[in-house]
Amino acid sequence: MTEHNPVKIEEAIRGVANQIANSVTACGDAYIAFLKADHEYDVAYAHAYLNAPGPAHGKRYDAELATINERRARDVADATYKHADRRAKALDAELRAWQSVGASVRSMYGAAGRGES
């Protein structure tokens, strides 16, 4: 078991806080990439649908097949964003856990006294 002391806990809290700050950028970038891929898929689908011959129900399937690469790119961008978001939430939970450990250690140090007689 690891011995916790206030200095190590503060270092851990600072490290997690820095990771959270970096995850904001990662989440933002991933979401922007998802929105771009989603828009590209919508536009490609609309063009494919309009250019497909035949009845409406057939156009839908033709458009789906014609835009499979755009759909795949959108799905990958969506998964990337969701992963970044879950990572940010996990870091937030880790920060709260370290704060709880810090409170326990401070309480333990406070209960030990200051060496007064």
Which role does the model predict for each range below?
Residues 1-24:
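Short, charge-rich amphipathic alpha-helices with coiled-coil/heptad character
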Residues 27-59:
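Extended alpha-helical coiled-coil "stalk/arm" regions
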Residues 34, 75-105:
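Long amphipathic alpha-helical coiled-coil segments
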Residues 51-80:
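Short, glycine/alanine-rich amphipathic alpha-helical segment
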Residues 102-117:
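Acidic, low-complexity, intrinsically disordered peripheral segments
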